[in-house]
């Protein structure tokens, strides 16, 4: 429900979420699964950056592929081409960011951070794909995680992606999977835009 002071999700909140979805009520940012989400938690919450829930979609002819993701990762978010840190572990001394992969090598040995992290996303498409093909698409979409989150897929993360389809448009699985990785990457990068004006 977007209010971090209220109770954990239960059946009544799940029912309300379904009603909201049916009515077309949806908010990106620090709402729903984005509430309280943070990234760059290797040194703990004090140096983490706020994260969010975001979406991104493209259309190629009649084919539509979209992604939704809530980023709550132990790692940082990086620009895919330059490698610049966009958000993550804060350097409390100079206000910049600390490289998450370098921090991983020394900071978390012997610490249990598993329960604090998960990046969870979904791919939604109108491609005609069966369950096996959609599982493959979800796997290919993980490339989007790996392009912009580092470290990613660690044992401290519960990274997962699901895929679903209205199954109306004939499409090649390789095309759908490649686009899925792209839109997931873009959705993750979009969470940074919501973070800049938010506190943890």
Predicted regions and their residues:
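A structural signal for small-residue-enriched, beta-sheet-centric alpha/beta enzyme cores
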Residues: 1-200
């Amino acid at each position: 429900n977007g209010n971090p002071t209220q109770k954990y999700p239960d059946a009544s909140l799940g029912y309300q979420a379904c009603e909201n979805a049916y009515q077309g009520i949806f908010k990106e940012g620090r709402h729903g699964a984005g509430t309280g989400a943070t990234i760059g938690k290797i040194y703990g919450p004090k140096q983490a950056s706020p994260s969010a829930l975001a979406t991104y979609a493209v259309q190629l002819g009649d084919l539509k592929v979209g992604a939704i993701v809530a980023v709550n990762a132990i790692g940082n978010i990086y620009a895919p081409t330059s490698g610049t840190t966009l958000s993550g572990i804060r350097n409390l001394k100079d206000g910049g960011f600390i490289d998450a992969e370098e921090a991983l090598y020394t900071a978390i040995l012997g610490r249990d951070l598993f329960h604090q992290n998960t990046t969870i996303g979904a791919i939604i498409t109108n491609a005609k794909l069966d369950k096996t093909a959609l599982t493959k698409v979800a796997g290919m979409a993980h490339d989007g995680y790996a392009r912009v989150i580092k470290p990613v897929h660690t044992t401290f993360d519960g990274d997962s992606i699901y895929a679903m389809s209205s199954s109306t448009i004939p499409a090649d699985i390789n095309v759908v999977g490649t686009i899925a990785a792209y839109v997931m990457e873009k959705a993750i990068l979009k969470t940074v835009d919501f973070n800049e004006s938010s506190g943890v």
